[in-house]
């Protein structure tokens, strides 16, 4: 069986947020996948596709796996968006410098959409978020996902406080 040529995992960093966008491993490639996760300091994986591997090995390495699948090519449900943004806010506040991995099948649609939502909620314009991710992950997003991101209205849930306890709401006029 021919192996699909999969893009390498890419790290997306913005403000205090670090994400790793990747494709899904199989049980056969799981050890290499875990090595990659550890290299980037991943503590949580969000799996947005159907399960293709047993999470026991990953969990044994201290990496928490969350299953939030949604249909390929489609936008995430409001419930998934709410869970994702809550996770991002809590993880980066409680574990500064940590990295959240997100994967779908190829790492080109569903996973980049969630990362783009975090960037938009962090203050980036939708066009900039798309371009920022596409610079690292060529071919990311289909037209339906782009339309979803364009229409998405941020709730500004990812405003973090600085070390003095002040909200980081900087605005350039």
UniProtKB/Swiss-Prot annotation:
Modified residues (Cysteine methyl ester): 170
First-listed, main subcellular location of the protein, grouped into a coarse class: membrane
EC assignment: 3.1.3.48
Enzyme active site: 72 (proton donor), 104 (phosphocysteine intermediate)
The protein's role, per its UniProt record: Protein tyrosine phosphatase which stimulates progression from G1 into S phase during mitosis. May play a role in the development and maintenance of differentiating epithelial tissues.
One GO location term (cellular component): endoplasmic reticulum
Keyword set, alphabetical order: Cell cycle, Cell membrane, Cytoplasm, Cytoskeleton, Developmental protein, Disulfide bond, Endoplasmic reticulum, Endosome, Hydrolase, Lipoprotein, Membrane, Methylation, Nucleus, Prenylation, Protein phosphatase
SUPFAM superfamilies per the UniProt record, alphabetical: (Phosphotyrosine protein) phosphatases II
Keyword Cytoplasm: yes
Binding site for substrate: 110
Reactions mediated catalytically: O-phospho-L-tyrosyl-[protein] + H2O = L-tyrosyl-[protein] + phosphate
Catalytic class of the enzyme: hydrolase
SMART domains: PTPc_motif (SM00404)
Protein location: Cell membrane; Early endosome; Endoplasmic reticulum; Cytoplasm
Residues covered by the Tyrosine-protein phosphatase domain: 8-161
PANTHER family, per database record: TYROSINE SPECIFIC PROTEIN PHOSPHATASE AND DUAL SPECIFICITY PROTEIN PHOSPHATASE
Record text on subunit structure and interactions: Homotrimer. Interacts with ATF5 and tubulin.
Modes of activity regulation: Inhibited by sodium orthovanadate and pentamidine.
Binding of phosphate, residues: 105-110
Entry protein name: Protein tyrosine phosphatase type IVA 1
Post-translational modification (record): Farnesylated. Farnesylation is required for membrane targeting.
GO MF: protein tyrosine phosphatase activity
Residues covered by region (Interaction with ATF5): 97-132
Family assignment from sequence similarity: Belongs to the protein-tyrosine phosphatase family.
Disulfide topology: 49-104
Membrane topology (UniProt): Lipid-anchor
């Amino acid at each position: 069986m021919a192996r699909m040529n999969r893009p390498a995992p890419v790290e997306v960093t913005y403000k205090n947020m670090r994400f790793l966008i990747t494709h899904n491993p199989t049980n056969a490639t799981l050890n290499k996948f875990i090595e990659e996760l550890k290299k980037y300091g991943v503590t949580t994986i969000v799996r947005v596709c159907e399960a293709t591997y047993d999470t026991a090995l990953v969990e044994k390495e201290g990496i928490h796996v969350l299953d939030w699948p949604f249909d390929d090519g489609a936008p995430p449900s409001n419930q998934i968006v709410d869970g994702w943004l809550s996770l991002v806010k809590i993880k980066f506040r409680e574990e500064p410098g940590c990295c959240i991995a997100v994967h779908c099948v190829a790492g080109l649609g569903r996973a980049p959409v969630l990362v783009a939502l975090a960037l938009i909620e962090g203050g980036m314009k939708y066009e900039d978020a798309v371009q920022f991710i596409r610079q690292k992950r060529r071919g990311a997003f289909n037209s339906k996902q782009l339309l979803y991101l364009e229409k998405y209205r941020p709730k500004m849930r990812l405003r973090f406080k600085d070390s003095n306890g002040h909200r980081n709401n900087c605005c350039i006029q």
